[in-house]
Amino acid sequence: YGNKGFAIRGVDENRVSISVDGLPQAETETNVVFSSYGLINSARPQFETEFIKKVEIKKGASSFEHGTGALGGAVNFETKEAHTMIEPGRIYGIQGKIGGDNMAKGRIYSLGGAVVYKGIEALALYAERTGHEVRNFGTGELRRSIFATRPDPMEYRQQSFLGKIAYRWGDHKLTASYYSQNKVTDSEVWSMEPAYVLTSQHEPYYYGHDQVLTRRYDVNYRFTPLESSWLNQLNIYVNGQQSFLDADTRS
């Protein structure tokens, strides 16, 4: 799992379907001419894993079940619900997390809460990630060279929010949810030589500023009859998603 999605048995990118609560995620868009110079943002929007309750991974072609784009396999995320964050016998729950790693100086902060009261279920989750380039054992000063051992400097910040509210009566449940994510990455490209060079030897070939912005809206009606001999569950979804990918590269 990486910047361009999942790789299953050697198949990756748009050939592996990714969906969240049944809604397919945006695919990568790659320009063959500009991508070789790092001038286009070919990343695939990533869903915040702190909001995930369950992951289903299927290998092999499954386009009949998951639609186009599932040549190599399919991955379906299922997001958290209010009752998954609340202990039995309570009507509310709060969770928080602080973590990090030394390899990329990464940090993660998450905070959320949920409440269940008289058929009403609600939750709100927020997560923020920051980090830098993955460090290696490269030495020497940072210089323009395709043979450089030090990684190109990079810094990113990702902010995500998930909100849900639901009302349950009898065998029926109506849920509305909203999800947003904004990831900004600033980088310096020292190791990828362009077709022309206009900068001095003491500056990078390129300065990069990439942004990935995602918003999605969901309304779900679920009917689960307890005494039906022919119907197990009925689901009706109305959803929408907007994804914006921007790459600002300058020398």
Go through each PLM region and give its residues.
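Transmembrane beta-strand segments of Gram-negative outer membrane beta-barrel proteins
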Residues: 53-54, 72-74, 79-102, 122, ...
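Structural signature of outer-membrane beta-barrel domains
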Residues: 13, 25, 80, 101-103, ...
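Acidic, small-polar-rich N-terminal luminal/periplasmic segments of exported/outer-membrane proteins
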Residues: 1-85
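Periplasmic-side early beta-strands and strand-to-turn transitions of outer-membrane beta-barrels
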Residues: 91, 104-108, 112-209
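Short loop/turn motifs that connect adjacent beta-strands in outer-membrane beta-barrel proteins
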Residues: 47, 66-67, 82-92, 119, ...
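Face-selective signature of the C-terminal outer-membrane beta-barrel domain
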Residues: 168-181, 212-251
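Membrane-embedded beta-strands of outer-membrane beta-barrel proteins
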Residues: 6, 55, 94, 110-111, ...
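Transmembrane beta-barrel architecture of outer-membrane proteins
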Residues: 3, 42, 70-72, 91-93, ...
